[in-house]
């Protein structure tokens, strides 16, 4: 019921910068085992940054992130560690055993692996977010930048409990399904003005016009 948990983490990235452009791309994957049997999850991430100077006055770019987290694993109930006799045997995979469901021979303490054997589960969370921007550099210290920042989050949850489990046979088993999705965005219009005089005095003003929506 308890493991020597191992965490694996892998990352790779590439980047380059030129006179009029630069980019960065990374990919990461993590596989995490919990100390309890079945208490595990995995995660995939990627990030992309791009920027290009289209001309002396115009710059465009984006910074985007995506992540996917899988929490489909089913952990056992470790409280059974303090309830079972050390002489119990784990017969969860032996349908002919009288102790397959209740290792103690009593129906008061169930095998912590038994319910998981008859359960199928998928639970995944995904996120996509970032910023797409354009910047305009104007004479006399003026500049304007527009940022579009979207965020999309969604998850999928599926669970099936089979009627082959004698504890669920009376109700014919059960199924559960859920989809959730959330999307929001915002647009920032940033106006900036910088002015320097007498070689030591600086004046700077910034104005922001914003719009946003969640759904």
PLM features: what roles do these ranges have?
Residues 142:
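Solvent-exposed beta-hairpin/edge-strand motifs
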Residues 1, 34-41, 45-129, 145-215:
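Surface-exposed loop/interface segments of Gram-negative outer-membrane beta-barrel transport/assembly proteins
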Residues 1-37, 75-77, 114-121, 134-137:
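Residues embedded in well-ordered regular secondary structure
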Residues 7, 18-19, 55-57, 137-139, ...:
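Outer-membrane beta-barrel channels and translocator barrels
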């Amino acid at each position: 019921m308890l493991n020597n948990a191992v965490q694996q983490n892998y990352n790779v990235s590439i980047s380059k910068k030129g006179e009029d452009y630069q980019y960065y791309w990374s990919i990461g994957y993590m596989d995490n085992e919990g100390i309890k049997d079945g208490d595990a999850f995995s995660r995939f991430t990627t990030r992309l940054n791009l920027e290009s100077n289209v001309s002396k006055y115009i710059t465009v770019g984006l910074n985007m992130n995506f992540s996917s987290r899988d929490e489909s694993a089913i952990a056992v109930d470790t409280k059974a560690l303090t309830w079972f006799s050390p002489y119990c045997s784990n017969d969860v995979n032996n349908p002919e055993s009288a102790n397959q469901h209740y290792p103690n021979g009593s129906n008061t303490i169930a095998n912590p692996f038994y319910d998981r054997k008859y359960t199928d589960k998928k639970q995944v969370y995904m996120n996509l977010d970032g910023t797409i921007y354009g910047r305009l550099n104007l004479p006399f210290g003026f500049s304007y930048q527009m940022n579009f920042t979207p965020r999309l989050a969604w998850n999928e949850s599926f669970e099936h409990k089979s009627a082959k489990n004698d504890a669920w046979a009376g109700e014919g088993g059960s199924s559960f399904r859920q989809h959730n999705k959330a999307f929001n965005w915002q647009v920032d219009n940033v106006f900036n003005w910088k002015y320097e005089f007498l070689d030591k005095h600086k004046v700077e003003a910034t104005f922001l016009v914003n719009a946003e929506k969640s759904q």
